[in-house]
């Protein structure tokens, strides 16, 4: 993709592109952006490349991150794209929501657990307890005027190993005013055939929901899996500049051009 040329959004009617360079991309070993660098990259992504959405940070990481998010939100507001700026937040007694609000943002990508193992072993909660905490956080975010998207962390493992748990959670979550469900292959375990199978099951079971797919490149399949997800009903793709990201990286930004086709 030519980074100096704006993406032609007229070619994509349904597929949203969310660039995660400033959040997941910064988890690349040895990569760290200063606040002014984050603002510069955000300007490029929102204005020059014209991606639909950007995820710019994880809440409550540092004062430097808070400064960067505030700068990006101020800029995005001046060009009418504040709704395109998203921040990863946590189920943490509303601290993430307040942090994002203090930065001037109002879109939270709330991190919930998409596998029984993550729920019971990481959080040491029952699914019912986790669900209650999620609902409370969403209620609070909505009271502050937020748009809420929801990550189902470890979704791919959940579909493979604990589908009953995942569907029980989704059956309740779809009743809430969640705008998008973000489905990550957190450990990078999927191949394209599994991606097709799992995404189709989600789309068929929850036909009125918007699903994003978030790939990891551990087996060099992030691009293939992302395209498989789109062909199977995903309405959003998560990408990063040059495939930056945790461990082996994420789906490449210029893959969105292939998705256009």
Describe the predicted segments one by one.
Residues 1-253:
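Catalytic cores and adjacent flexible loops of soluble metabolic enzymes
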Residues 254-261:
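Conserved small/polar residues in nucleotide/adenosyl-binding loops
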């Amino acid at each position: 993709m030519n980074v100096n040329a704006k993406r032609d959004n007229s070619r994509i009617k349904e597929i949203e592109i969310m660039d995660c360079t400033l959040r997941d991309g910064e988890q690349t070993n040895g990569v760290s952006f200063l606040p002014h660098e984050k603002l510069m990259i955000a300007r490029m992504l929102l204005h020059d490349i014209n991606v639909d959405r950007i995820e710019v940070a994880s809440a409550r990481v540092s004062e430097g991150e808070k400064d960067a998010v505030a700068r990006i939100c101020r800029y995005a507001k001046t060009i009418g794209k504040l709704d395109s700026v998203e921040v990863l937040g946590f189920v943490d007694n509303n601290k993430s929501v307040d942090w994002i609000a203090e930065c001037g943002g109002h879109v939270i990508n709330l991190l919930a657990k998409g596998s029984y193992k993550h729920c019971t072993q990481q959080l040491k909660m029952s699914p019912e307890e986790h669900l209650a905490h999620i609902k409370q956080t969403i209620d609070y975010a909505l009271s502050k005027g937020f748009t809420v998207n929801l990550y189902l962390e470890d979704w791919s493992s959940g579909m493979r190993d604990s589908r009953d748990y995942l569907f029980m959670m989704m059956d309740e979550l779809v009743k809430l005013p969640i705008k998008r469900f973000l489905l990550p292959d957190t450990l990078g375990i999927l191949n394209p055939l599994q991606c097709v199978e799992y995404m189709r099951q989600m789309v068929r079971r929850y036909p009125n929901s918007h699903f994003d797919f978030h790939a990891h490149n551990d087996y060099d399949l992030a691009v293939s899996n992302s395209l498989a997800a789109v062909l199977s009903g995903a309405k959003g793709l998560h990408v990063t500049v040059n495939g930056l990201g945790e461990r082996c990286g994420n789906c490449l930004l210029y893959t969105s051009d292939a998705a256009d086709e």
